[in-house]
Regions:
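Short catalytic/signature loops enriched in Gly
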Residues: 13, 17-23, 37, 101, ...
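ABC transporter nucleotide-binding domains
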Residues: 1-270, 339, 345-350
Length: 350
């Protein structure tokens, strides 16, 4: 077993515009496949297939896309939450606070013990059901956070009580069991749990799923407020484009296990370049607009046997012959605006 590995101290938020471009996370050509072997037959599901992007210091980076686009598999890979049959088969995932490993999946257990919760936390999909129903809320905080924060039991509990107050919860909830709390309260508890150690990086997977609109708005405002206060970076995943419009700073669009467009969020909504992004934005309801919404024909690709070339071409209204033959490269078409589309970037694949 390797010896102790020293980790960098938590970073302080940087106010200057130039410094804000410094990446906290660098994802490079990551490939993560579900590999199964049954009755002599091997099967690879290419859930994440060559994804590259950065998350900058003190920003909220959004990932959008329909179900089965690879969003959740990608963030599980980034978080190191990998279990068979999922395997990382290529690429690298480097955090600024852990530069010596090509991903958490490659780090030894003693390093993961130091990193998780203290430097990186993960609000999982369906996190309202993650809390242990047999333990009071304060016990869950002790289980995950006390070893990182240290101090006496009394000092720790006072810090937790102060922190849950920041997410607009009465500290009395700490003595409650999860089933005694509403859905919105449990979600606030999980967000408080993910931020109690003031991590540099937070991954949030569909944190507003199953919440009503009023509670959802409150939770989103709370996430933004805590992120600004701590200066953390957030990788925020949801299929809801309306949520991205109100919360994220930059937005990546995934389709068929690949990133197809990335830009500052206002730019994505004002000037979508990829046909799939245009469809996602066009499907949003608008007050006073009774125009029928046209559905996208076809089905998402089978990632165990994906179509050649661009994976969107069987459903794309702009598809050309080259689309079925060559994978479109991700090209910076406008400053800070990348897109992978032959129709938008003709000749880029040559």
């Amino acid at each position: 077993m390797s010896g102790p590995v020293a980790l960098k101290q938590p970073m302080t938020p940087v106010a200057s515009a130039a410094a804000s471009t410094e990446p906290v996370l660098q994802v490079r050509d990551v490939q993560a496949h579900f590999r199964t072997h049954h009755f002599g037959v091997s099967r690879d599901v290419r859930a994440v297939d060559g994804v590259t992007f950065d998350v900058r210091r003190n920003e909220i980076y959004g990932l959008a896309g329909e179900s089965s686009s690879g969003k959740t598999t990608l963030i599980k890979t980034i978080a190191g939450a990998i279990k068979p049959p999922l395997e990382v088969v290529g690429g690298s995932i480097r955090f600024s606070f852990l530069p010596d490993y090509p991903g958490l999946h490659a780090a030894p257990p003693e390093v993961l013990e130091r990193v998780r919760w203290r430097h990186l936390s993960y609000v999982m999909q369906g996190s309202m059901n993650v809390l242990n129903p047999m333990r009071r809320v304060i016990d869950t905080f002790r289980d995950f956070a006390w070893r990182h924060i240290g101090g006496s039991r009394r000092a720790f509990e006072e810090r937790v009580a102060d922190h849950v107050s920041r997410v607009r919860l009465d500290p009395a909830v700490l003595r409650a069991y999860p089933h005694e709390l509403s859905g919105g309260m449990r979600q606030r508890v999980t967000i408080a749990l993910a931020t109690i150690c003031k991590p540099e990086f937070i991954i949030a997977d569909e944190p507003t799923t199953a919440l009503d609109v009023i509670v959802q708005k409150d939770v989103l405002g709370m996430i933004r407020g805590i992120q600004r206060e701590m200066g953390s970076s957030v990788l925020f995943v949801t299929h809801d484009m309306g949520v991205h419009a109100h919360l994220t700073d930059r937005l990546g669009i995934m389709y068929g296990g690949r990133l197809v467009e990335e830009a500052p969020t206002p730019e994505v909504f004002a000037r979508p370049l990829h046909p799939y992004t245009t469809y996602l934005i066009g499907s949003l309801p608008r007050i006073g607009d009774d125009t029928p919404r046209k559905s996208l024909e076809g089905s998402p690709p089978n990632l165990a046997d994906p179509p050649p070339g661009c994976r969107f071409h069987p459903r794309c209204p702009l598809a050309m012959d080259i689309c079925s033959r060559q994978v479109p490269p991700m090209v910076e078409t406008l400053p800070g605006h990348r897109v992978a589309c032959h129709a938008v970037n003709p000749g880029a694949a040559a």
